[in-house]
Amino acid sequence: MSALNLTVRVHPVVLFQVVDAFERRNADSHRVIGTLLGSVDKGVVEVTNCFCVPHKEHDDQVEAELSYALDMYDLNRKVNSNESVVGWWATGNEVTNHSSVIHEYYARECNNPVHLTVDTSLQGGRMGLRAYVCIQLGVPGGKTGCMFTPIPVELTSYEPETFGLKLLQKTVGVSPAQRPKTVPPMLDLAQISEASQKLQSLLDLILKYVDDVIAHKVTPDNAVGRQLLDLIHSVPHMTHEQFTQMFNANVRDLLMVITLSQLIKTQLQLNEKLTFLPTA
């Protein structure tokens, strides 16, 4: 498959690690680079992890601690053998003159490595994210070169990562002095209540869009219409009585789990107090 047909999907933990490495950089370092880890399947490069590689850039050369990169990769393989080298990342919003030299090293580590740039300067108030592949240029028997060509990049996340992002959003706009250092886990019923309120707000937003389209206040979008149609078809067909019975059964199961967990917690606390009682 051609490198130009690749699509890059980046998980949030990768961006967090890039920002953390940028904040911990040396005072004389203007750019931070590192290795991207993940998997490639059917033209999709899924980046699930990364680590920083110490390096120094001079006017005419680049010095990178390749032995450190190999050691970090070997350690990561012991923890997660499914993650392989898929490319490399760098902070900044552009490809520099030294990028081709670094990319040449990663081309020996994997096929069609991708280059991810993360704009940690937040130009325009956003963290710019771009992905590139290197395309060889030249004529047969002549001098060859390479050109970094942009490819599609998007953010994706697993379900646990989505929950973590939602918790982080609760601290947005809160001053550092008032920002809590820890976030206690929510009770199951509180999570259901919060999810129901969010679902209700999303339904209100959809209904407003449909009403505006019918009233010719908004130009209809065919892509949105197809997604709404798929959403309607995904709703299971059942009567009101069947839905009520299924919902009540799930609520009873949830309450039973909560009750058992509270009993176990009480028993553990009682056992702990009995353990530390002085013996006669």
From Swiss-Prot:
Entry keyword set: Cytoplasm, Initiation factor, Protein biosynthesis
Subcellular location: Cytoplasm
Domain of life: Eukaryota
Annotated disulfide bonds: none
Positions of the MPN domain: 8-138
SMART domains linked: JAB_MPN
Record CDD domains: MPN_eIF3f
Pfam families in alphabetical order: JAB (PF01398), MitMem_reg (PF13012)
Record's function text: Component of the eukaryotic translation initiation factor 3 (eIF-3) complex, which is involved in protein synthesis of a specialized repertoire of mRNAs and, together with other initiation factors, stimulates binding of mRNA and methionyl-tRNAi to the 40S ribosome. The eIF-3 complex specifically targets and initiates translation of a subset of mRNAs involved in cell proliferation.
Sequence similarity: Belongs to the eIF-3 subunit F family.
HAMAP family with a match to the protein in the record: eIF3f
Record text on subunit structure and interactions: Component of the eukaryotic translation initiation factor 3 (eIF-3) complex. The eIF-3 complex interacts with pix.
Protein's name according to its UniProt entry: Eukaryotic translation initiation factor 3 subunit F-1
Species the sequence originates in: Drosophila grimshawi
